[in-house]
């Protein structure tokens, strides 16, 4: 590996520090209680708007094939 200049080294060190903090906290880093309150409030709004579905799963869609009728073509 090539040697990093001081700015690059500082940047890489901060990224590693952030990753470590995130892994230990198990969620957002440096988020206070107001963050969780805001998140809960916004999720509540979404549930009210979109039918109280689980916001962590992708919805299941069921599509039915259209029914076609056979139509006789007139002979010309």
Swiss-Prot record:
Gene3D superfamilies: Mitochondrial ATP synthase-coupling factor 6 (1.10.246.110). GO terms for biological process: proton motive force-driven ATP synthesis. The keyword Oxidoreductase does not apply. Keywords: Acetylation, CF(0), Hydrogen ion transport, Ion transport, Membrane, Mitochondrion, Mitochondrion inner membrane, Phosphoprotein, Transport. The modification Phosphoserine is found at residue 76. It is found in: Mitochondrion; Mitochondrion inner membrane. The modification N6-acetyllysine is found at residues 9, 14, 47, 52, 67, 73. It comes from the Eukaryota. Subunit F6, of the mitochondrial membrane ATP synthase complex (F(1)F(0) ATP synthase or Complex V) that produces ATP from ADP in the presence of a proton gradient across the membrane which is generated by electron transport complexes of the respiratory chain. ATP synthase complex consist of a soluble F(1) head domain - the catalytic core - and a membrane F(1) domain - the membrane proton channel. These two domains are linked by a central stalk rotating inside the F(1) region and a stationary peripheral stalk. This is ATP synthase peripheral stalk subunit F6, mitochondrial. The lineage of its organism: Eukaryota, Metazoa, Chordata, Craniata, Vertebrata. The gene is ATP5PF.
